[in-house]
Amino acid sequence: PDVPAIVVAGEDWNAGVIGIVASRLVEKYYRPSIVLTRQGDIYKGSCRSIAGLHLYEALAACRDTLIQFGGHEMAAGLTLARDRIEDFCRAFANYVDTRMAIEDFTPKISIEALVAPADWTLAAVEELALLEPYGMGNPRPIFGVRNLRPQTAAAIGAEGRHLRMEVGTREHRVAALC
């Protein structure tokens, strides 16, 4: 990949939100992400990982550039001196680059079940709605469909940010909004 990891730093960023920002970077770019905020002569950071990279082990490999660190496989925190930030960025990117294959930077999606387009009925959607609300303890179900092809597509909305389309197989089509 062009960039194996993302490390961003800022002056006096709110330490209470840098973990959220790191998570959003992972969601958007699917790269291990570290967000650092400067506090005097040190940087404190929040880290989030992707599947296949044990974040604590990655930070342990960079320990000579850090004041302290802690965490687990998918999330961690760290502290480093202001004058070590470039050394840390280089060491962390090198560690990620040597441990991850190009296909590791594509997110994997776990599906609940394979379904046929003919099974997508209003009654089925209403039945799924009974499982709401979705969240951490009750994730939104994801279904897979084989041999699905887009049939038509058109941008909609004031800024064209949504897509109205028909998808389906040769035998059955379903309207979809994205």
Name these PLM-found stretches.
Residues 10-11, 25, 38-39:
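Fold-independent oxyanion-binding glycine-rich loops
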Residues 1, 5, 27, 45-178:
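Acidic, two-metal ion nucleic-acid-processing modules in DNA metabolism proteins
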Residues 2-22:
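Flexible, glycine/threonine-enriched loop-and-boundary segments that flank and lead into catalytic domains
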